[in-house]
From Swiss-Prot:
GO terms for biological process: rRNA base methylation. It catalyses: cytidine(1402) in 16S rRNA + S-adenosyl-L-methionine = N(4)-methylcytidine(1402) in 16S rRNA + S-adenosyl-L-homocysteine + H(+). Its EC number is 2.1.1.199. It is found in: Cytoplasm. Belongs to the methyltransferase superfamily. RsmH family. This is Ribosomal RNA small subunit methyltransferase H. One of its GO terms (molecular function) is rRNA (cytosine-N4-)-methyltransferase activity. It is an enzyme of class 2 (transferase). Specifically methylates the N4 position of cytidine in position 1402 (C1402) of 16S rRNA. It comes from the Bacteria.
Amino acid sequence: MSHISVLLFETVESLLADRTTGVYIDATFGRGGHTRLLLSKLDENARVYAFDKDPQALEVAAALAQEDPRFTIIHASFADIKEKMQEIGVQSVDGIMADLGVSSPQLDQAERGFSFMQDGPLDMRMDNSKGLTAAEWLLEVEEEDLANIIYQYGEERYSRRIARAIKQAGKLDTTAQLAEIVKTAHPKWEKHKHPATRTFQAIRIAINKELDDIEVFLPQAVDLLKPKGRLSVISFHSLEDRLIKQFIQKESTLAEDSGWGMPQQQVDTRRLKKISRVRASEEEVKANPRSRSAWLRVAERLEQKGA
């Protein structure tokens, strides 16, 4: 299956807000669908920078950089976005977009170890040049910690019995082995959902530190945005969406009075204005079922107070 970018036009249009030039960042290049559309809307003076840590994504990005001198790829996690941009002399940008989660090619390639639908080595690393594989991590993690991770990151109600079964199995080498253990341990299957779905999601999030990276990325992204610059982020599950929602809420709400019952003037620390929250259309969901769970949240950088 080729990768189909989710909420493609909605994301790029929300990012540009009718602009045709400027400096932009795609924080999750993937296979470049959003970046290519963005470049097609921009004039010759614009610049687009993209981040990714997946070696296969970097190959696609390197080819695009050869085709289009306005584009630069940076081999790094978006959690390092501010530091990496400052290293190349970019202090502020007009827009930042991110498409979170695993891309279709990663899921479809058995050797990447993300999918329970195809047998492959139990890997799951976004950047397979460093860090523990899922197989190595499962050997090291304590049963109680594993149960908590499956519960928190997979929102799996049977996390304890699944964690117990995984740890009792000992060394696991393939995705099929893990999927079968989870399937056997799971007492109640959800309609239209493989019983290993939530557990695989939880392990992937844990070994790639996905939620940690999002929490680090969001405030840095706002730091980089110019006034009226846009932040457009696509999430695919409730954990990601909750983080983004809470962050935008916090950055767009007046701080509560903490005057211990005494009158105190509120300080306006708001940095963002909510713009929109968008779901994929029925037509897009039919064409690309993966888009069913996707949410796009858009916010705009406010003018700096006292500037």
